[in-house]
Amino acid sequence: MFQKPKGTRDFLPEEMKKRKTIEKKLRKVFDSYNFSEINTPTFESFELLSKKTGDEIRTQLFVFRDHGDREMGLRPELTSSVARFYINEFKNTPKPVKLYYFTNCFRYENPQAGRYREFWQMGSELIGSKKPIADAEVVNMAIEGLKEINMDFEIHIGHLGVLKGVFEKYNLSDDEGNEIRRLIDKEDMDGLKSVLSRLESEKNIEISKKVFEVLDLKGGKEVIPILKEKLADFESSVAALENLDSILEFVPHDYVINFGIARGLDYYTGMVFEVYGKKEGAKQVCGGGRYDNLIELFEGEPSPAVGFAYGFDRIMLNIDDFEVENESIFVVPVKSSEMLLKECLKIAKTLRDSGKSVEVDLMGRKLNKALNYANTKNIKKVLIVGENDIRDGKVSLKNMETGEQSLIELKDILNI
């Protein structure tokens, strides 16, 4: 017997209804900010996908060669694809360009709860504005989406420029700075201490104290002036703190300032944020930030950009279970006859034309078995079509929750 590939899932109808319900609510928030939906190819050139993704994600790419011997990969996330799409299609569009997407992505990693080899992301990219209010709009939209689905969460916001300013002050190379960022992202404090100790010995500097002063300070907006004082001699770090302060002026929500957010992707340049669900062990359900150099790196015009993505599967694990109301109507004849079946189809078409979901009995069941079928499908309303009733322009409406049954006029059928 064939089995689904490791790290993938089949979604049953009830699960799909729940996913569609949450998707619809999140789309409503994106649409309310006038973001436009796009989609991109499932696979892109390996060169594009690997250019600025980070070492860990690069090793997780699904890679193949096409019949023209070109190296391709399945998308591990969407930002690189959207940047390429922007260069191809939107570079002459008035700014800002506001785009969103909902699609599947692929990474070859060890499957576990909330982590799969095929997974879904829903996210947005705002391209063309470097103003703090643009960063704030993206943060606010991410927060409001999670509030729309009643998820319990905590958002942490930081700025990569703070630590980058420290690295610059101590003359660290980009590779050395990126190594430190990756260790912070993995929360490998032992590895971080080891690397900092080695750098102190090699360069005769005292960097560890400053790095941990930045990492250890967490809280509300009051931490910004505290850290500005501690980093008064670090000009770039102070500028980053002032930029973050300006962004947070436009964020009227609760948040935790956390400069330990490093993000696993190498293209972020400024403000970054992560959202953690409180239900499943505080796992990350959303992340994003500013990436001002990515489009230029892909040979486009310099274009500031900021965006985020929800891990849709993680979100589904973090919301309380709920039942999606089945609003379908089941139409069944009292007995199997060509005349009654034709009447059932007429009634079904009338209801469908008005936007209702309707199922007609296709099995020729006896009435009791048809009603049992409706119960198993959690259908609340059943229309029973009989010869005498039809001649009188009526049908029976049975409420499957209460068991009540009444005759209604066919002309009133759209009101049920």
Swiss-Prot record:
Annotated EC: 6.1.1.21
Protein biosynthesis listed as a keyword: yes
One Pfam family this sequence matches: HGTP_anticodon
Recorded GO MF terms: ATP binding; histidine-tRNA ligase activity
Principal cellular location given in the protein's record: cytoplasm
Annotated GO biological process: histidyl-tRNA aminoacylation; L-histidine biosynthetic process
Subcellular location: Cytoplasm
Record-linked SUPFAM superfamilies: Class II aaRS ABD-related, Class II aaRS and biotin synthetases
Catalyses which reaction(s): tRNA(His) + L-histidine + ATP = L-histidyl-tRNA(His) + AMP + diphosphate + H(+)
GO CC aspect terms: cytoplasm
Alphabetically ordered keywords of this record: Aminoacyl-tRNA synthetase, ATP-binding, Cytoplasm, Ligase, Nucleotide-binding, Protein biosynthesis
Domain of life (superkingdom): Archaea
Record-stated family: Belongs to the class-II aminoacyl-tRNA synthetase family.
Protein's name in the database: Histidine--tRNA ligase
Gene name in the database record: hisS
